[in-house]
Structures are given as structure tokens and as C-alpha cells.
């Protein structure tokens, strides 16, 4: 519903951007023609293909599937309501994987067809002439990238002083610089106080910044202010399952709730709300139910922002280390010194590795640049395996690739890098 359709559209956006950038390399194309019906059809085809594949794998493994709306009746029973009937299922064990849904802002009429959520925006009913995105987090910026590439004039309003709160500022900077060129406006430290229908069409948005109020008109508004766990409307009040003050189901390292035979995984079980974390948790829960020794003990969970450039990080961020007074040292390699990135016409990236100053082991990695999401896995492996700077720098990486910037960053830390001139520290 979210990951695959959005990444399908982001791929289209990336190709369109790369096509445009080829002008700097002596290659030009006529203006691309965007068939929105064709784009929508392609996106739906990919989703259907993957969904049917999952159904076939379940059938091959003799997993019975029942389509319907499930609600708990007790700690050991659920009711499944489908179009034709209701049935009660008694279970020995249950795994709750109900996910999350888009958060809303009080006073913004989400029932208005021109007020979109990340889910309804992916339906691509139409491409608005101008679009305001409320929220400068990963969902808002990814959707802004998509709609900008499809022809919308995009603006973003973020309540906090910076885009992508939580990410290291040095990683966000290259993306912010590019988005300022692509987007019409980026309103920071801005509160949206109201969204009202305009005549004859569109929406009038009232904004507040530094105590001053202004109004702007947009064809559509996309609310992207985070997600909330789907713990309501599934009958949890009929059980003794504990929900914390943020609405998440409380689980232990085995993904078990306070009810011995009920487990919870994914967005409904707590942050970070990431599909790959949910998959890992699901495997843990399944193994525990089967009597195997398993628990969720991941030292590193990668996060990726699929904008252009992409941003990815894993482990401790530099901002987190500073905030929590965690001692660290780092090695950074600018992609302006990477032959592969220069050949691609993309020199804005950087790879950063954060090390424990005593053991020299990797405790965090941050990357910004094309394909950062594909590159971050090496960082996750380095953290999980306890790799130190020497382990990474002495591992031969293929040349010319973006992946070798990971080794280069470790070499910078070690003082052995040859792709950059860094004066030796005195003493």
C-alpha cells in the first residue's frame, strides 16, 4: 500500500530527473510526455504482481488465508467479517500485524477530496497544478519528489526549523539545496492553522510563522505528518493486551505481548515504523511460537529516504551522539573525490562512518547521494559484525563504484586515504 507503489513512482521521478541532467553531458531529449493513466496502471501492475506472488507462496506452504475485517472477541478468539458472512476463529497463538495509518491534523477536513493522505495521493486520481505538502519528513519529501516530476508546482510546510528532523544536518543539506530549486516554496518553522475550501475550487491555507499569519491558495493539500498505529477498531478492548501511552502494543524481545499467546509485530508494535524491521520481527515471532530460541536483537536498523539524492543512515547518528554525550570519532569521504560519482554528474554526496574512539568499531553510518539506500547495507553489516575501521579499509572494494566510498571513509579515519590529501595531524 505504501512502500512499493511509492518507490515505483519515485523510480519514474528519478529517471525523468536523470534524463534532464544529461543535457550537461551533451545529450538532449524532447520534453517527455506523461500519461498519468499509464503511470497509474504500471504502479498497480507492480503491486498486483507482488500481492499475487505472496498469495501463491502462502498457498504453496499450505497457509490458509481468509479475507475480511478481524476484531478480537477475547484473548483467544477473533471474529472475521467478510462481505458474505461472519465467522469466529479460536486460536492457540496470534500475531497482530495491523500496521499503521496516516496521522491527521485537527481542523483539517480530511473528508475533502482535495485533502490527500500519503495513501490517497498514491492513487494518482489527478496531478494538481499546485500542491502544498504539510510535513517535511520522509513521506512528505518523497511524495513531493513524485508530484514535482509529474508536473505539479510543489510547496512544503514544516512545523520544525529543519527538513527531516532526526537526520544529521550535513546529510540533509545536499537534498535541501536541490529541493529549494525544484520546489516553489519550503516553509520552515511554519504552523498550518486552517485549510478551507475555495471558490470555485481549490483550498485556502492559513499559515502562521513568527507570530505572523498569511494565506495561500492551492489546488490540493497533502497531509504527511507521520503515522499512527492501528490499535483502534480491532477489538483490543475485549482483551487484556496492554497498549502504551503512544498507542503502540507493548511487546518483549520475543515480540510477545503481556498475553502469552498473542504477539505483535511491525508499526503497531513501536518505532521505527519500517517494513524491514516488521519482517524481522515477524520471523522472530514465528520462530518463538514454533519453540525455537529467538528474540529481536538487532543492533542496527537502516533508515532510507528515497528522494533524489537519497539519504540513508544506520546505527547512531552524529546528532544522537552529541545529544546523548556518546564519545565518537568519524571518517568522512566527499563524493566530489569519487570517480564514479563524477562520471554520473553527481558530486553532492558523502559517506560518513562513526566509530567508537576506544575500540575503533563502527557504531553508525550515514550516506547521502544516489543509491544511498542500496549502499547502507554494508554499514548495517559492519555494525552487526563489530567491524572496526581497519576491517573496512583493508577490504578491497571494486573501482570505480559508489560502494568504495565506504572504504574511503574508513581510510580517512585511519589516515591511509590516497584519494584525498589530508594533512597529517601534528604529533
Regions from the PLM with identified roles:
Residues 1-127, 160-164, 170-173, 178-187, ...:
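Glycine-rich flavin
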Residues 3, 96-157, 182-186, 237-239, ...:
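Glycine-rich dinucleotide-binding loop and its adjacent helix/turn
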Residues 30, 64-67, 71-84, 89, ...:
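A Rossmann-like FAD-binding core segment of flavoenzymes
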Residues 111-128, 215-289, 374, 382:
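FAD-site-proximal beta/loop scaffold in flavoenzymes
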Residues 134-137, 167, 267:
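Glycine-rich Rossmann-fold phosphate-binding loop(s) that bind the pyrophosphate
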Residues 139-160, 177, 181, 256-263, ...:
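Active-site substrate-recognition segment that forms the wall
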Amino acid at each position: 500500500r505504501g512502500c512499493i507503489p511509492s518507490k515505483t513512482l519515485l523510480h519514474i521521478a528519478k529517471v525523468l530527473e536523470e534524463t534532464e541532467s544529461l543535457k550537461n553531458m551533451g545529450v538532449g531529449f524532447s520534453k517527455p510526455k506523461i500519461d498519468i493513466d499509464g503511470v497509474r496502471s504500471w504502479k498497480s501492475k507492480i503491486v498486483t504482481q507482488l500481492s499475487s506472488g505472496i498469495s501463491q507462496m502462502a498457498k504453496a506452504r499450505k497457509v490458509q488465508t481468509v479475507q475480511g475485517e478481524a476484531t478480537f472477541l477475547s484473548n483467544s478468539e477473533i471474529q472475521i467479517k467478510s462481505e458474505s458472512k461472519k465467522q469466529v476463529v479460536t486460536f492457540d497463538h496470534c500475531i497482530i500485524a495491523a500496521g499503521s495509518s496516516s496521522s491527521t491534523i485537527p481542523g483539517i477536513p480530511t473528508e475533502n477530496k482535495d485533502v490527500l493522505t500519503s495513501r490517497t495521493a498514491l492513487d494518482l486520481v489527478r496531478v494538481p497544478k499546485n500542491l502544498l505538502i504539510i510535513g517535511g519528513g520522509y513521506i512528505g519529501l518523497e511524495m513531493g519528489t513524485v508530484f514535482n516530476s509529474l508536473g505539479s508546482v510543489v510547496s512544503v510546510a514544516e512545523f520544525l526549523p529543519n527538513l527531516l528532523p532526526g537526520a544529521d544536518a550535513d546529510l540533509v543539506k545536499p537534498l535541501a539545496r536541490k529541493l529549494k530549486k525544484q520546489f516553489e516554496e519550503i516553509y520552515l518553522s511554519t504552523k498550518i492553522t486552517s485549510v478551507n475550501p475555495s471558490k470555485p475550487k481549490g483550498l485556502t491555507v492559513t499559515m502562521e510563522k513568527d507570530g505572523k499569519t498569511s494565506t495561500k491558495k492551492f489546488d490540493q493539500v497533502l497531509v504527511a505528518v507521520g503515522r499512527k498505529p492501528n490499535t483502534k477498531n480491532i477489538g483490543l478492548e475485549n482483551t487484556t493486551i496492554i497498549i502504551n501511552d503512544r498507542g503502540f502494543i507493548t511487546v518483549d524481545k520475543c515480540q510477545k505481548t503481556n498475553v502469552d499467546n498473542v504477539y505483535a509485530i511491525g508499526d503497531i508494535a513501536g518505532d521505527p515504523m519500517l517494513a524491514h524491521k516488521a519482517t524481522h520481527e515477524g520471523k522472530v515471532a514465528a520462530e518463538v511460537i514454533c519453540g525455537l530460541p529467538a528474540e529481536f536483537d538487532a543492533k542496527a536498523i537502516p533508515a532510507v529516504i528515497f528522494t533524489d539524492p537519497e539519504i540513508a543512515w544506520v546505527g547512531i547518528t552524529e546528532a544522537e551522539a552529541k545529544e546523548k554525550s556518546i564519545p565518537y570519532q568519524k571518517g568522512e569521504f566527499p563524493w566530489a573525490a569519487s570517480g564514479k560519482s563524477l562520471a554520473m554528474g553527481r558530486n553532492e554526496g558523502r559517506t560518513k562512518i562513526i566509530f567508537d574512539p576506544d575500540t575503533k568499531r563502527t557504531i553508525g553510518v550515514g550516506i547521502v547521494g544516489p543509491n544511498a539506500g542500496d549502499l547502507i547495507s554494508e554499514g548495517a553489516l559492519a555494525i552487526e559484525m563489530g567491524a572496526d575501521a581497519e576491517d573496512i579499509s583493508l577490504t578491497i572494494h571494486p573501482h570505480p563504484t559508489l560502494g568504495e566510498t565506504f572504504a574511503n571513509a574508513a581510510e580517512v579515519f585511519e589516515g591511509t586515504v590516497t584519494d584525498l590529501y589530508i594533512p597529517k595531524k601534528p604529533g
